């Protein structure tokens, strides 16, 4: 096992369930002495003589004193999450009891696991590659159906299989080209250049699709920030509360009530939107607190992915709309024009007044056309339906490495077009293989691995 190479011949222990009071807590051990350590504490059965993937009920005892009645799950190597012997102890969910069990394991020879160390051992023991390991972290942090399904698809090897096939094909052709170099004086060609060209063209299309999926993947994983801007008392706080179905922001008839930005999260069709209710933009305010809020609004526009410009259809003019569009366009942000309080003016009259603009007319207070606004928000960030069965890139590290893969494939294709020599072609292939292997972890910097796994929770 590779853990011996990394000096991991010890046994680790950690709480695998969230800290705090609960019905049960699960303590996980992994390593060469996991079974022996638990055997010293669990006297009901000799776990070393039990079959893998079995469950046993009994008491944890230390110095002949009962600690807790537990359920022990046994997973013998290599058929476990880490590829090592793994024992999971299900005890009562008291933090005190959990710590008693953990400390007893440590006294018998285990050490406390580092964040992500169980998954790191699974990676180093070949139970999963680096993309799958990162998908495990994504599942743990997922907070929508779309993010969970996308991460699950990648954890099952959806992304890995694509890279594996490309890598194996490149290695096969690379070996043939390297063989040609050994017979360079005989002018023989083992690698079919036509087939290789077709392979590179296909790989380029697949890589391009993966790169293009990152925009959607980033939305699925991290959500979209939406700044709600407009003049004071346009109804921004009312709209925020309507979208959230609760009274979060202060709503008042007094202009300039929102003195600071208010942020809330809403899930619309599996996409997280971080809605930012901002202070109204009023250039000639003399209120110091309000002026600070206005400045924060400008900053939030710069930081947001989308902008909703909300205006009162009864008081604003076409000139106001043109001014607002100019302000937002200068920031290069996508925006939606939303005319509020249409119930007072009437939708037809409002549409006639602002003809020529793409505007959604609503009544935030009267709950009119809110669903239309939600649909537009989703359409702004998602083209068509989200198909989580397809491989979607959500990780910036993968995206950056795939850009290098795409560039390398272009270099290989250019080399084939220009009939470059085999040695130069082999260099381009090796470069491409390097970046593919960097994604999957076939070659990895130890510092990179430590950084990736440090983001996991302890116990995973």
Predicted features and spans:
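A glycine-rich (often HGG/GG-containing) alpha/beta subdomain
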Residues: 1-149, 153, 157, 331, ...
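C-terminal-of-GTPase-core extension/linker across diverse P-loop GTPases
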Residues: 3-15, 19, 58, 148-267, ...
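Switch I (G2) and immediately adjacent beta-strands of P-loop GTPase domains
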Residues: 57-76, 256-285
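Glycine-rich, N-terminal phosphate-binding loop of Rossmann-like dinucleotide-binding domains
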Residues: 93, 243, 278, 311-314
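Short, Asp-centered acidic motifs that coordinate Mg2+ and/or phosphate
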Residues: 273, 306, 336
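Generic enzyme active-site microenvironment
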Residues: 275, 310, 338
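Catalytic P-loop NTP-binding/switch module of NTPases
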Residues: 290-293, 297
């Amino acid at each position: 096992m590779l853990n011996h190479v990394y000096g991991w011949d010890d046994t680790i222990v950690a709480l695998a369930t969230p800290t705090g009071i609960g019905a049960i807590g699960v303590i996980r051990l992994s390593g060469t002495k996991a079974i022996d350590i638990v055997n010293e504490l669990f006297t009901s059965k000799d776990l070393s003589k039990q079959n893998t993937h079995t469950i046993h009920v009994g008491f944890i005892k230390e110095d002949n004193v009962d600690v807790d009645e537990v359920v022990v799950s046994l997973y013998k190597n290599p058929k476990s999450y880490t590829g090592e012997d793994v024992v999971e102890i299900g005890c009562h969910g008291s933090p005190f009891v959990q710590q008693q069990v953990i400390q007893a394991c440590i006294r018998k020879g285990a050490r406390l696991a580092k964040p992500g160390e169980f998954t790191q051992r699974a990676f180093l023991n070949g139970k999963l590659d680096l993309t799958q390991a990162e998908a495990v972290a994504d599942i743990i942090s997922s907070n929508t159906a779309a993010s969970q399904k996308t991460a699950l698809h990648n954890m099952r090897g959806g992304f890995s299989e694509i890279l594996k096939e490309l890598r194996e094909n490149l290695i096969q052709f690379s070996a043939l080209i390297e063989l040609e170099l050994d017979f360079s004086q005989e002018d023989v060609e083992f690698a079919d250049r036509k087939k290789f060209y077709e392979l590179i063209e296909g790989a380029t299309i697949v890589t391009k699709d993966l790169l293009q999926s990152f925009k959607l993947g980033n939305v699925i994983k991290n959500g979209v920030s939406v700044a709600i801007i407009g003049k004071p008392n346009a109804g921004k706080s009312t709209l925020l509360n309507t979208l959230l179905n609760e009274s979060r922001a202060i709503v008042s008839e007094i202009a300039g009530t929102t003195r600071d930005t208010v942020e809330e999260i809403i899930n619309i069709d599996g996409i997280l939107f971080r809605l930012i209710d901002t202070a109204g933009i009023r250039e000639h305010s003399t209120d110091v607190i309000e002026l600070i809020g206005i400045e924060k609004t400008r900053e939030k526009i710069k930081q947001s992915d989308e902008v909703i410009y909300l205006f009162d259809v009864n008081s604003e003019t076409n000139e106001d709309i043109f001014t607002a569009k100019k302000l937002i366009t200068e920031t290069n942000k996508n925006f939606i024009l939303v005319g509020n309080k249409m119930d007072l003016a009437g939708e037809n009259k409002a549409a006639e007044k602002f003809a020529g603009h793409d505007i959604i007319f609503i009544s935030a207070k009267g709950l009119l056309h809110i669903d239309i606004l939600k649909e537009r928000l989703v359409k702004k960030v998602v083209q068509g339906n989200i198909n989580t069965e397809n491989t979607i890139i959500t990780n910036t590290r993968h995206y950056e490495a795939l850009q290098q893969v795409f560039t390398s494939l272009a270099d290989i294709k250019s080399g084939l077009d220009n009939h470059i020599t085999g040695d130069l072609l082999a260099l381009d292939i090796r470069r491409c293989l390097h970046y593919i292997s960097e994604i999957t972890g076939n070659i990895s910097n130890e510092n990179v691995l430590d950084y990736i796994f440090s983001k996991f929770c302890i116990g995973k």
